[in-house]
Amino acid sequence: MKWTFILAVAAGGALGSVARYLVGIGFGKWLGPKFPWGTLFINVTGSLLIGIFAGLFAVRWSLPQAARIFLVVGICGGYTTFSTFSLDTFYLIERGEMASAAAYMIGSVVLSVGALIAGIQIVRVI
């Protein structure tokens, strides 16, 4: 275990978490709290971002491992919110909003995987 990797995760995680918080608050103020649009947006854009990083690491970027860990594990890990997604789904189900819960689950997974694929494809094209 290298301390540089731990510090990279901590620093990136702090930045990603702050970004997630600000985006979530912004969406809540913009669209209201009834549906977890902020979490959906965060998961989709986080998947796009990690796809772009993966694509760049594979073909273009020759970054040190600590930098890769900072970007992917730190920033993307701090930014994406799968655990929050699970809790938001539970709340929708608990309120009896089964159609919203199903749409949210399917939409989150399909759009996030699609965004990851798009991120990799973007890098392959440019």
From Swiss-Prot:
The chain crosses the membrane at residues 5-25, 39-59, 69-89, 103-123. GO terms for molecular function: fluoride channel activity; metal ion binding. It is a multi-pass membrane protein. The keyword Protein biosynthesis does not apply. It is found in: Cell inner membrane. It catalyses: fluoride(in) = fluoride(out). Pfam families: CRCB (PF02537). Na(+) is not transported, but it plays an essential structural role and its presence is essential for fluoride channel function. One of its GO terms (cellular component) is plasma membrane. Signal peptide: none annotated. The keyword Phosphoprotein does not apply. One of its GO terms (biological process) is cellular detoxification of fluoride. Na(+) binds at residues 77, 80. Keywords: Cell inner membrane, Cell membrane, Ion channel, Ion transport, Membrane, Metal-binding, Sodium, Transmembrane, Transmembrane helix, Transport. PANTHER family: FLUORIDE EXPORT PROTEIN 1-RELATED (PTHR28259:SF1). Belongs to the fluoride channel Fluc/FEX (TC 1.A.43) family. Fluoride-specific ion channel. Important for reducing fluoride concentration in the cell, thus reducing its toxicity. NCBIfam families: crcB, PRK14195.1, PRK14198.1. This is Fluoride-specific ion channel FluC. The gene is fluC.
